């Protein structure tokens, strides 16, 4: 049995629609799950949450929903309650708090918490990348370049650090035009 071009077109269209439907449904389930978790945490209330891990999870959901001021409050409370947590958890919470501040263009505060994250876990390339990005936003190009170089020592294949350090290298080595006499006339 031979398929006409119209039948082939319909089959291909049907397969494409099924694939798109699967992706849309998966995204719907993911978003619904996040929304339900957010509602669950909001119903509990910030005051009833005392575990740093719960607070981190709540703050992460708030970041995904771009509720940065609320996430800052949540992460600050997590920091108050994380004395018994491992250094890795402390670093992740401090990095998330720094990210929340950076998202609101409060880069000096962000740098403070990125440095706390790095103090807890010195070989944490994500916090180092975020620190360098905040330094770059504050026009501290030499510091940002040095920080990206630290990232590259830890992770030579880090795409963000490679790209940003090349950009900063061009910016740092840039020499403005000095006039006609230097042109050779």
Regions inferred by a protein language model and the residue ranges of each:
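Canonical positions in the second alpha-helix
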Residues: 44, 78, 116-117, 150-151
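TPR/Sel1-like alpha-solenoid repeat signature
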Residues: 55-58, 62, 74, 93-101, ...
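Register position in tetratricopeptide repeats
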Residues: 64, 103, 137-138, 167-171
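Helix-start (N-cap) detector for alpha-helical repeat units in TPR-like alpha-solenoids
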Residues: 52, 86-87, 91, 125-126, ...
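Terminal, low-structured helical/coil segments at or just beyond the last alpha-helical repeat
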Residues: 3-18, 153, 157-185
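Long, contiguous interaction/recruitment modules in multidomain scaffold/adaptor proteins
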Residues: 1-53, 60, 67
């Amino acid at each position: 049995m031979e398929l006409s071009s119209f039948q082939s077109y319909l089959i291909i269209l049907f397969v494409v629609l099924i694939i798109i439907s699967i992706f849309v449904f998966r995204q719907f389930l993911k978003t619904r799950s996040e929304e339900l978790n957010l509602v669950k945490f909001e119903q509990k209330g910030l005051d009833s949450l005392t575990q740093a891990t719960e607070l981190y999870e709540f703050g992460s959901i708030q970041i995904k929903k771009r509720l940065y001021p609320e996430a800052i409050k949540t992460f600050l409370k997590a920091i108050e309650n994380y004395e018994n947590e491992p250094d890795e958890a402390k670093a992740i919470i401090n990095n998330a708090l720094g990210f929340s501040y950076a998202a609101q263009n409060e880069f000096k505060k962000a740098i403070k918490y990125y440095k706390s994250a790095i103090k807890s876990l010195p070989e944490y390339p994500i916090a180092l990348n975020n620190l360098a990005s905040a330094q770059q936003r504050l026009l501290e190009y030499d510091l940002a370049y040095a920080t990206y170089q630290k990232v590259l020592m830890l992770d030579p294949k880090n795409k963000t650090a490679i790209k940003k350090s090349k950009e900063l290298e061009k910016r740092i080595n840039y020499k403005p035009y000095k006039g006609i006499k230097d042109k050779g006339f």
